[in-house]
Amino acid sequence: MDTLAQLTQEHDALRILLERIEAAAEARDAVALSASLQAARAALTSDLDAHISVEEAEAFSPIAETLGAGLVAPFYEEHVEIRATRDDVYARLERDEAPYAQALRLCDLILAHQQREDMMLFPSAREAVFR
């Protein structure tokens, strides 16, 4: 499986977890939100960090070299914002807070980011860079 296909597959797997988190946060169900965030902890921490590392090294770098750094710059910036928001969500959870707004923001950030990658960036890169 090529790198872009692997990354897209990882997006699909994470999307399922994010939908559960989003539903719990929208319902303002503290118990369900906590359970969903705990169930997704590895996916949103170590797995997400590994995913971002692969994405930046094996996808963004070649795309930047071929199509220009300006194309991927916003995606790098979003990675920083996603990690910071994620860290805030889990810090609040550790303080026994129900981070409804922060969890919704995290879901929105990741889902929008994934959609732009899967629908715009990766198809363009597949044609121009990863033939």
Q: What does each model-identified segment do?
A:
Residues 1-131:
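Small-residue-biased structural context
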